[in-house]
Amino acid sequence: FPDQDDFGRVFYLNARMSAAGIPQLAAIMGNCVAGGAYLPVMCDTLVMTEGSGLYLAGPALVKAAIGQDVSSEELGGATMHAEVSGTVDFKEPDDQHALARLRRLAAAYAPPELAPWAQARSETRPPRAKEQDLVGLLPVEGGTKPYDMRAVLARLLDASEFDEFKPEYGETLITGMGRLGGYAVGVVANQKLVIKRKGAIEIGGVIYAEAADKAARFVLDCNQAGVPIIFLHDVNGFMVGKQSEQDGIIRRGAKLVNAVSNSVVP
């Protein structure tokens, strides 16, 4: 609930800076508990190192409050938040990799004195992967052969470099940052491979609830950063069925539609 001078003020300032278009990048490199857990999550992008914890209450308090025995990793570890909750955007093995990730992310933001999409251009570097291989990767017209969209991106983006956003979450859509012709770009692409995760199989080329949620957040992040978006799509549609409806496919799909409709970057 609202307050003026207590901890809610910190939340308020966090949210207002975001609304003002001030980029906020956060890294969790240790335990982040209780009210403080909200602050990094309210930032535009969140990086978390393995071995860290993010939860409203730690294992000891959970045990005392509701009698539940749970490990720190199960409750709020980096892997759980990267693969299950989707709270973490990038999981890194240690502090050094987390800081390197933050530097790469910050480098993609548009300088404030330029128009949002007038990115500082770096030297164009050809893809390391052979562009000619695209012919063999993609199915012929009308074909249904699965293919790996990451392999396609490796043949399109500068130096075949791609910083993937939430790679372990909502895996039927691929989102992330790269460069094209020296300019920073965001990429939203569908994955055509069959995804096996959490004991379930997800069909490539179909948008599931988690994937829609991820893509919507990424489109918003690109607009916050002033980064143009490239869409690579070979999509059959949104997933249907009982589980999909219970997962909120309509609500979360609508979030994606809304985010793309209100996007102002090229």
List each language-model region with its residue ranges.
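Ligand-binding clefts of soluble mixed alpha/beta catalytic domains
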Residues: F1-P266
